[in-house]
Regions:
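Glycine-rich, charge-decorated loop segments at or immediately adjacent to ligand/cofactor-binding or catalytic sites
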Residues: 101-114
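Short acidic-hydrophobic, aromatic-tinged amphipathic segments that line or gate anion-handling sites
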Residues: 122-127
Length: 165
């Protein structure tokens, strides 16, 4: 049985939503099945569906935009809950530092999620080098977990469909 999703994207809505949506688009164009709560949770059943999606996806991608972890000191913070669930589930965690905006782990971040500081960030350039940096992240971080895609389709600079194999 195959998973419904390859990648779950976790992000802080303020400061991270635009990065998460671009990552979802780029990864989907390359053949990955991506869960993004903004698109998937239209009916308001939040917690149960979030946890089910994290459980389904082998990769947990964490968008570390500026101040992304500031509210993780609160027990009821959803980004914190998502990170904890991914850690407990043994997911491959891929922190993404968009445009080098992440300002680091603060002392008030709970020890239970502090282990993400030991994981190397994937720095994604959301400017002209977007495609190149996403492809590098795929090669270095996703393919070892998810394997090769039979056909990874995405658009080249001209907007034409391109094939990467």
């Amino acid at each position: 049985m195959s998973n419904k999703y390859d990648i779950f994207i976790s992000y802080r809505r303020v400061g991270g939503a635009q990065y998460a949506r671009i990552l979802q688009l780029m990864l989907s164009q390359r053949g990955y099945r991506v869960f993004l709560d903004y698109d998937e949770l239209k009916d308001g059943v939040f917690g149960k569906k979030i946890k089910a999606a994290i459980q389904e996806a082998p990769v947990f991608m964490l968008v570390l935009s500026k101040n992304a972890l500031d509210r993780c000191k609160n027990d009821d913070d959803w980004v914190r809950e998502e990170i904890l669930f991914a850690i407990e589930g043994g997911k491959k965690i891929v922190p993404v530092n968009p445009d080098k905006t992440f300002d680091g782990i603060h002392e008030q971040i709970p020890k239970s999620i502090r282990e993400i500081t030991d994981i190397q960030n994937s720095e994604i350039d959301f400017g002209q080098a977007l495609g190149v940096t996403v492809d590098l992240m795929i090669t270095d971080r996703l393919k070892p977990v998810l394997g090769e895609r039979a056909s990874e389709k995405h658009k080249d600079e001209d907007g034409e469909a391109a094939q990467v194999t």
